């Protein structure tokens, strides 16, 4: 634990650290990446507040990234018109930004440790682009990594908001665009955020985190990359 951070209550959250390397990196407390999925009902005001309070007392810096890319493509695949999809995405993102602002207010003096950006903003940075080149190449050249990404696509599509009207080729294309946009954050968040080490924090173990947290050959996570599943105690107990 770094200077300035003190042992803190768990804020009702339970951690599951994925792998021995992640455990060592997690102990440093240098940087956390919190990914927020727009439209995901898990990220209620209550859960988001608990998550940010938990991170604010455990990490020197925390980047919060909310995904605002390729959401409209999924809605269009569901049968919405382009105009309907655009309006729906705008409403969803407006509500999400409001919840994030309120959640940051709850962390008090720790708010200065946080930076909030959309994925589309992050995509404009040279650091993200450099890592994206590597993950795109790995998707084409490393069959096992590609399989993990495809498993993630199916998970995204099957758990999308809405009525679940079935899975089409359009859904899978939209899901792949969504997952490949996120892949740099899974594989090398230290590189994307220019930090020595980073802990990716999410409420479930995804196909990509499960794969990269164990991979020792071929395309691997960056040396300073760690993974933690963190969620409210009552949800962890029910899992």
UniProtKB/Swiss-Prot annotation:
Impact after mutating residue 178 to A: Almost inactive
Family: Belongs to the CDPS family.
Transmembrane segments: none
Keyword Transferase: yes
This protein's name: Cyclo(L-leucyl-L-phenylalanyl) synthase
Source organism superkingdom: Bacteria
Record-listed E.C. numbers: 2.3.2.20
Subunit structure: Monomer.
Keyword Transferase: yes
Catalytic site positions: 37
One of the GO biological process terms: antibacterial peptide biosynthetic process
Keyword tags: Transferase
UniProt GO MF annotations: aminoacyltransferase activity
Gene: albC
């Amino acid at each position: 634990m770094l200077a300035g951070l003190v042992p803190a209550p768990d804020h009702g959250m339970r951690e599951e650290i994925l792998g021995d390397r992640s455990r060592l990196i997690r102990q440093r407390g240098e940087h956390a990446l919190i990914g927020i999925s727009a439209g995901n009902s898990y990220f209620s005001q209550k859960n988001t507040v608990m998550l940010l309070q938990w991170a604010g007392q455990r990490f020197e810096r925390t980047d919060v990234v909310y995904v605002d890319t390729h959401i409209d493509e999924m809605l269009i695949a569901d049968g919405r018109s382009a105009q309907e999809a655009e309006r729906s995405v705008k409403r969803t993102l407006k509500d999400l930004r409001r919840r994030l602002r309120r959640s940051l207010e709850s962390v008090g003096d720790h708010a200065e440790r946080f930076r909030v950006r959309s994925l589309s903003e992050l995509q404009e940075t040279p650091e993200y682009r450099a890592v994206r080149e590597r993950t795109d190449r790995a998707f084409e050249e490393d069959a096992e990594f590609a399989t993990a990404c495809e498993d993630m696509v199916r998970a995204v599509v099957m758990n999308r908001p809405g009525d679940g009207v079935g899975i089409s080729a359009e859904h899978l294309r939209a899901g792949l665009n969504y997952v490949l946009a996120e892949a740099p954050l899974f594989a090398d968040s230290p590189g994307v955020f220019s930090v020595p080490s980073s802990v990716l924090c999410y409420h479930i173990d995804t196909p990509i985190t499960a794969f990269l947290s164990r991979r020792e050959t071929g395309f691997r996570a960056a040396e300073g990359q760690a993974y933690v599943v963190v969620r409210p105690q009552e949800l962890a107990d029910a899992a």
